[in-house]
């Protein structure tokens, strides 16, 4: 039995789960929030209990120390030597990594270089990794890349129709994101269907505040909606997704704004928030739809339109589809959003959906299509943390 910790760090947060492997038992989970702000918060769940404490967390090293102290203080581990490995989520690994890897100086250097493509994520990942390395110097560390699963895409899927030198000189191409989630949902759906993942054609829909859709043929990614960065693809909570590039410099001229200003508009003020004028939270948007708010209704229609355009294109690229799986915040919990999407696709794809069942399913595995549906439709809650733990155990030989 080995204890390994899965780590998912952001610029101001640190989420964790401690697993007992190979049973995959979650011993504890939680997060540190508002790191670097005047007052932070630390939450930990264990033995059916949940504790939240507000306290200053000036940096990730302090967050890691608080976490490790809590593990022994609460008796979750007798001593920190019981932890044999740490797996870290890395948002951007570019084309350099097609699988998870044990961390060494060269790996660390490459991840740092890719920070230009993920300035909010990769630097924070490295700060957190170094904090764990300092506090737990005798354990192995593994990097698990959001981009790795997508490295099987063919050139026609990952290349952009821009000057070729942009690709050779500046690495401009589609990398995708949420790969660990898409990989888990792909394999788990195959298990639920009783099928070999290497014989299935599937479309996985990771619909959260950030959202991406992936076409998977025989267990390998054929295409994915996010692009060079997580700004590309479908409409999201605050991100615009794919738009006519002319909009960017046209509006920069009109508004007299800087590139940083435009980055804020596209990443933080667009998507559901931008269209609804209400919120980036789909629950608030649904409340507006239920109340008959015109912009709320438009937001729902626009989101549905963007999703089905991608799913439809992937259907043709795959040739046929055995299953469509919904996951992440909206995908797992928003039955109204799922219903709008499925009703928009049912005639074209030959879907037969149990909408009464769909309305009752929130955050649990379920087949919501009927036996006569040409494509099975599943809800499969994602579990990126367990994938990180599995890869950590495998690569460290625990």
Predicted regions and their residues:
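Glycine-rich phosphate-binding loop of actin/hexokinase-like ATP-binding domains
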Residues: 149-252
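Adenine-nucleotide phosphate-binding core of ATP-dependent small-molecule kinases
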Residues: 264, 271-275, 282-317
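Short beta-strand-loop/turn "lid" adjacent to the catalytic site in phosphate-handling enzymes
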Residues: 71-121, 142, 148-157
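Glycine-rich phosphate-binding/hydrolytic loop that grips phosphoryl groups
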Residues: 332, 354-398
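Short glycine-rich, Thr/Ser-proximal phosphate-binding strand/loop in the N-terminal lobe
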Residues: 4, 13-58, 227
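Phosphate/pyrophosphate-binding loops at sites that engage ATP/ADP/AMP, CoA/4′-phosphopantetheine
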Residues: 69-83, 189-196, 311-322
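Glycine-rich beta-strand-to-loop/alpha-helix junction loops that act as flexible
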Residues: 10, 88-92, 207, 325-333
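Glycine-rich phosphate-binding loops at beta-strand->alpha-helix junctions
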Residues: 322-345
